[in-house]
Amino acid sequence: MADVLERVTKIIVDRLGVDESQVTLEASFKDDLGADSLDIVELVMELEDEFNMEISDEEAEKIVTVGDAVNYIKSRL
Protein backbone atom coordinates (compact mmCIF):
# COMPACT_ATOMS: atom_id res chain seq x y z
CA MET A 1 0.00 0.00 0.00
CA ALA A 2 1.30 3.41 -0.97
CA ASP A 3 2.35 5.87 1.71
CA VAL A 4 -0.43 8.16 2.97
CA LEU A 5 1.42 11.29 1.80
CA GLU A 6 1.89 9.84 -1.70
CA ARG A 7 -1.79 8.97 -1.98
CA VAL A 8 -2.89 12.38 -0.66
CA THR A 9 -0.45 14.12 -3.02
CA LYS A 10 -1.82 12.26 -6.04
CA ILE A 11 -5.38 13.29 -5.18
CA ILE A 12 -4.33 16.94 -4.74
CA VAL A 13 -2.37 17.01 -8.01
CA ASP A 14 -5.25 15.39 -9.90
CA ARG A 15 -7.97 17.55 -8.34
CA LEU A 16 -6.22 20.96 -8.24
CA GLY A 17 -3.91 20.62 -11.23
CA VAL A 18 -0.88 21.78 -9.26
CA ASP A 19 2.68 20.53 -9.69
CA GLU A 20 3.67 17.74 -7.32
CA SER A 21 6.58 19.89 -6.06
CA GLN A 22 4.05 22.40 -4.65
CA VAL A 23 2.45 19.76 -2.43
CA THR A 24 4.37 19.95 0.85
CA LEU A 25 3.20 19.18 4.37
CA GLU A 26 3.16 22.92 5.13
CA ALA A 27 1.21 23.89 1.98
CA SER A 28 -2.16 25.49 2.68
CA PHE A 29 -4.93 24.25 0.40
CA LYS A 30 -6.33 27.77 -0.05
CA ASP A 31 -3.28 30.02 0.18
CA ASP A 32 -0.57 27.90 -1.45
CA LEU A 33 -2.48 25.51 -3.71
CA GLY A 34 -5.26 27.85 -4.85
CA ALA A 35 -8.19 25.71 -3.69
CA ASP A 36 -11.57 27.33 -3.19
CA SER A 37 -14.23 26.05 -0.82
CA LEU A 38 -15.76 23.73 -3.44
CA ASP A 39 -12.33 22.27 -4.22
CA ILE A 40 -11.82 21.55 -0.53
CA VAL A 41 -15.20 19.82 -0.22
CA GLU A 42 -14.34 17.67 -3.25
CA LEU A 43 -10.87 16.91 -1.86
CA VAL A 44 -12.37 15.77 1.44
CA MET A 45 -14.82 13.53 -0.43
CA GLU A 46 -11.99 11.99 -2.44
CA LEU A 47 -9.91 11.45 0.70
CA GLU A 48 -12.89 9.74 2.33
CA ASP A 49 -13.22 7.41 -0.68
CA GLU A 50 -9.49 6.74 -0.99
CA PHE A 51 -9.03 5.90 2.68
CA ASN A 52 -12.49 4.41 3.28
CA MET A 53 -13.33 6.75 6.16
CA GLU A 54 -15.76 9.48 7.03
CA ILE A 55 -14.50 12.97 7.84
CA SER A 56 -17.04 15.09 9.74
CA ASP A 57 -17.67 18.68 8.70
CA GLU A 58 -16.17 19.84 11.99
CA GLU A 59 -12.99 17.85 11.37
CA ALA A 60 -12.82 18.91 7.72
CA GLU A 61 -12.79 22.57 8.79
CA LYS A 62 -9.63 21.89 10.81
CA ILE A 63 -7.81 20.44 7.78
CA VAL A 64 -6.08 23.53 6.41
CA THR A 65 -2.75 22.16 5.17
CA VAL A 66 -1.57 19.01 3.44
CA GLY A 67 0.08 18.00 6.72
CA ASP A 68 -3.24 18.38 8.56
CA ALA A 69 -4.85 15.97 6.08
CA VAL A 70 -2.02 13.44 6.32
CA ASN A 71 -1.96 13.55 10.14
CA TYR A 72 -5.75 13.23 10.36
CA ILE A 73 -5.76 10.19 8.07
CA LYS A 74 -2.80 8.52 9.80
CA SER A 75 -4.47 8.96 13.19
CA ARG A 76 -7.53 7.07 11.98
CA LEU A 77 -5.96 4.19 10.08
Swiss-Prot record:
Key words of the record: Cytoplasm, Fatty acid biosynthesis, Fatty acid metabolism, Lipid biosynthesis, Lipid metabolism, Phosphopantetheine, Phosphoprotein
Domain Carrier: 2-77
An annotated GO BP: lipid A biosynthetic process
Disulphide bridges: none
Domain of life, source organism: Bacteria
GO cellular component: cytosol; membrane
Post-translational modification: 4'-phosphopantetheine is transferred from CoA to a specific serine of apo-ACP by AcpS. This modification is essential for activity because fatty acids are bound in thioester linkage to the sulfhydryl of the prosthetic group.
Residues bearing PTM O-(pantetheine 4'-phosphoryl)serine: S37
Localization of this protein: Cytoplasm
Pathway this chain belongs to: Lipid metabolism; fatty acid biosynthesis
GO molecular function, one term: acyl binding
Function summary: Carrier of the growing fatty acid chain in fatty acid biosynthesis.
Family according to the record: Belongs to the acyl carrier protein (ACP) family.
Protein's recorded name: Acyl carrier protein
